[in-house]
UniProtKB/Swiss-Prot annotation:
Gene Ontology molecular function: cinnamate beta-D-glucosyltransferase activity; hydroxycinnamate 4-beta-glucosyltransferase activity; sinapate 1-glucosyltransferase activity
Encoding gene, per UniProt annotation: UGT84A3
Name used for this protein in its record: UDP-glycosyltransferase 84A3
List of residues binding an anthocyanidin: H19, G384
Keyword flag Glycosyltransferase: yes
Catalytic activity: (E)-4-coumarate + UDP-alpha-D-glucose = 4-O-(beta-D-glucosyl)-trans-4-coumarate + UDP + H(+); (E)-ferulate + UDP-alpha-D-glucose = 1-O-[(E)-feruloyl]-beta-D-glucose + UDP; (E)-caffeate + UDP-alpha-D-glucose = 1-O-[(E)-caffeoyl]-beta-D-glucose + UDP; (E)-sinapate + UDP-alpha-D-glucose = 1-O-(trans-sinapoyl)-beta-D-glucose + UDP
Naturally occurring in which organism (per UniProt): Arabidopsis thaliana (Mouse-ear cress)
Entry similarity comment: Belongs to the UDP-glycosyltransferase family.
EC number, as in UniProt: 2.4.1.120, 2.4.1.177
Keywords: Glycosyltransferase, Transferase
């Protein structure tokens, strides 16, 4: 089959695991419907690791369902040893300057397979500028909750009061959201945050989405989970197509494909180890790819797990390349009680019957995976949207218990409290309630991605519109 006859979609991702994975899942789904997808991110550090972990060859078409996907990696322009790559304030404008030209060059290189749509995630908002300049429809994948999107929207338009330097402790009242205390709003919006640059880039994406009238705004959620908030946002932004298409990882599970976005090879024996455990006997612990806890806090969590009597599967990442963080050391007796790995297939782990609960940083990817697996969460957020996600898990979805309030709290949670919260999530009436609620959300998520479900129909509508645009352009002789 001639790939040049396929509708061609180019996806551009910020180089980070939590950004790459959802966008790649979307890309695989698009390809599976008979389209051609080119997935683009930077060569270092993530592209290089993706290539190694997945045996990816640049530009080579890989079949996915009825279509194809390929990968392109471009240089970010930094020398190998340039530490500015790991300084977001320096990296952001540099990536924009280099990336705009690289994406233009890629689009022109594939002129015999004209790009019908450009899709990006929120940390590379400048892709919308490229799309507008080249007169290509664009779409954005939002990889946080619709609740967080609403918070950013209200902050950007100054529709309600948010914490300020003079009033840092005020709560925030947003329609369709629970009352958020000052440390429960997305932390990048708080004036005390050391990471306000992350909030700025997200706000840049919001501005571009409104100004450029992007083709679609995808959200990795499902309608049944955030119905009222989505209806409210659709009323606020009638010109936008706000389209929930999640859980993306669940949608992508229906595909037979070896294309993955992992930066590391998962531990090969962790699933076999789980097979040897009793049902609901293991706490799974992972704090994502970015968050770094203090050694003292890691030790308190370790001793809390030991006191709880649960077995543990714990993902402890080595320090990221270019960062100056000491590797964590865990008590030897914990290793005898459980299994410590650098990486694991989280979706499969959470679905395993041995998992009793998930001690999580509450990033949105992990939140969606826990809800879809029907697993209770012990919430230990650090920053960004994680603190808001923790509110929803504990108070709205009612599948979680709160262990901490975020890095801004600047306190070490004791081993006694860790053990108490682990037991609360796994033993007794509260644990039964959490598990029942989690199973209910699991069923709702499965219904959303099933044939004819809300997310499935939203996705099919998008693909149909893209294909129609492509056919119309061909009929008009456009290239």
């Amino acid at each position: 089959m001639d790939p040049s006859r396929h509708t061609h979609v180019m996806l551009v991702s910020f180089p980070g695991q939590g950004h790459v994975n959802p966008l790649l899942r979307l890309g695989k789904l698009i390809a599976s419907k008979g389209l051609l997808v080119t997935f683009v991110t930077t060569e270092k550090p993530w592209g290089k690791k993706m290539r190694q972990a997945n045996k990816i060859q640049d530009g080579v078409l890989k079949p996915v369902g009825l279509g194809f996907i390929r990968f392109e990696f471009f240089s970010d322009g930094f020398a190998d040893d340039d530490e500015k790559r790991f300084d977001f304030d320096a990296f952001r404008p540099h990536l924009e300057a280099v990336g705009k030209q690289e994406i233009k060059n890629l689009v022109k290189r594939y002129n015999k397979e004209p790009v019908t749509c450009l899709i990006n995630n929120a940390f590379v908002p400048w892709v919308c500028d490229v799309a507008e300049e080249l007169h290509i429809p664009s779409a954005v994948l939002w990889v946080q909750s619709c609740a967080c999107l609403t918070a950013y929207y209200y902050y950007h338009h100054r529709l309600v009061k948010f914490p300020t330097k003079t009033e840092p402790d005020i709560s925030v009242e947003i329609p369709c959201l629970p009352l958020l205390k000052h440390d429960e709003i997305p932390s990048f919006l708080h004036p005390s945050s050391p990471y306000t640059a992350f909030g700025d880039i997200i706000l840049d994406q919001l501005k571009r989405f409104e100004n450029h009238k992007s083709f679609y705004l995808f959200i990795d959620t499902f309608r049944e989970l955030e119905k009222d908030i989505m209806d409210h946002m659709s009323q606020l932004c009638p010109q936008a197509i706000i389209s929930p298409v999640g859980p993306l990882f669940k949608m992508a599970q229906t595909l037979s494909s070896d294309v993955k976005g992992d930066i590391s090879e998962p531990a090969s024996d962790c699933m076999e180890w789980l097979d040897s455990r009793e049902p609901s006997s293991v706490v799974y612990i992972s704090f994502g790819t970015i968050a770094n806890l203090k050694q003292e806090q890691m030790e308190e969590i370790a001793h809390g797990v030991l006191s709880s009597g649960l077995s543990v599967l714990w993902v402890v990442r080595p320090p990221m390349e270019g960062t100056f963080v000491e590797p964590h050391v865990l008590p030897r007796e914990l290793e005898e009680k459980g299994k410590i790995v650098e990486w694991c297939p989280q979706e499969r782990v959470l679905a395993h019957p041995a998992i009793a609960c998930f001690l999580s940083h509450c990033g949105w990817n992990s939140t969606m995976e826990a809800l879809t697996a029907g697993v209770p969460v012990v919430c230990f957020p650090q920053w960004g949207d994680q603190v808001t996600d923790a509110v929803y898990l504990a108070d709205v979805f009612k599948t979680g218990v709160r262990l901490g309030r975020g890095a801004a709290e600047e306190m070490i949670v004791s081993r006694e409290v860790v053990a108490e919260k682990l037991l609360e999530a796994t033993v007794g009436e509260k644990a039964v309630e959490l598990r029942e609620n989690a199973r209910r959300w699991k069923a709702e998520a499965e219904a959303a991605v099933a044939d004819g479900g809300s997310s499935d129909m939203n996705f099919k509508e998008f693909v149909d519109k893209l294909v129609t645009k492509h056919v119309t352009r061909e009929d008009n002789g456009e290239h």
